[in-house]
Regions:
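A short glycine-/small-residue-rich loop at the edge of a beta-strand within enzyme catalytic domains
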Residues: 21-24, 28, 63, 67, ...
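Conserved substrate/cofactor phosphate-moiety recognition/catalytic segment
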Residues: 39-89, 128-130
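Long, low-complexity intrinsically disordered regions
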Residues: 1-16
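Short, glycine/acidic-enriched loop or turn micro-motifs at the edges of active sites
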Residues: 35, 54-56, 97
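Conserved GTP-binding G-domain of TRAFAC-class P-loop NTPases and closely related GTPase folds
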Residues: 12-14, 19-20, 24-31, 36, ...
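Glycine-rich phosphate-binding loop used to anchor ATP phosphates in small-molecule kinases
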Residues: 67-121
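ATP-dependent NMP and nucleoside kinases share a basic, alpha-helical "lid"
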Residues: 58, 98-138, 147-156
Length: 181
């Protein structure tokens, strides 16, 4: 090379498009009642989310253990933080995230690390959620489910979401339900 200049490599013809919004990646928060289909949706899409149920299973050998919520969620946030520090481009959180207050710490953490935040809202009637829960052998008492349904608030862009996807169920002929997107 004369003069120390380095020729720039040719740009490949099929270079990936640059995202319109510069950032490190995305955090997707699932939002919905127990039994609304959050975990099933992730399984169907072959996605392995950070899951409060899975963490309870790992820590306490019981996905239904509810006595140590602060411990579960502080560990779950630490796991997400580790993924953000490692610059993992896609991050999914599988938890109920019922209220703006519940979602705030996730959104703040993601934004602090320069990540985009999207909501995946499972808008499913409480009766269907309770029926599904009974079928899978996990029983959240009806009064607790109804209390949770009363707390559930749909996500809004004002919370900091850049995109909100709503997942609903559609009725089949025999009254059975299946998820729809």
């Amino acid at each position: 090379m004369v003069g120390g200049s380095v020729p720039s490599p040719a740009v490949p013809a099929q270079a990936a498009p640059v995202p319109a919004r510069a950032g490190k990646g995305t955090v997707v928060l699932a939002i919905g009642l127990p039994g609304s289909g959050k975990s099933s949706w992730f399984k169907r899409h072959d996605i392995h989310p950070l899951s409060s149920d899975l963490l309870r299973e790992l820590l306490f050998d019981d996905a239904e253990e509810q006595r140590f919520q602060d411990l579960v969620f502080s560990n779950l946030r630490s796991m997400l933080k580790a993924r953000l520090i490692a610059r993992r481009p896609m991050n999914y959180v599988d938890a109920t995230n019922l209220t703006p207050h519940d979602r705030h710490s996730w959104i703040k953490l993601a934004k602090d690390y320069g990540y985009d935040v999207q909501g995946l809202f499972f808008d499913v009637p409480v009766e269907i959620c309770m029926e599904r829960h009974q079928r899978r052998g996990r029983l959240v008492p009806e009064d607790i489910m109804r209390k949770m349904a009363g707390k559930l608030k749909a996500p809004t862009f004002a919370e900091g979401f850049s995109k909100i996807t709503v997942v609903r169920v559609k009725q089949k002929e025999e009254g059975a339900v299946s998820p729809s997107e």
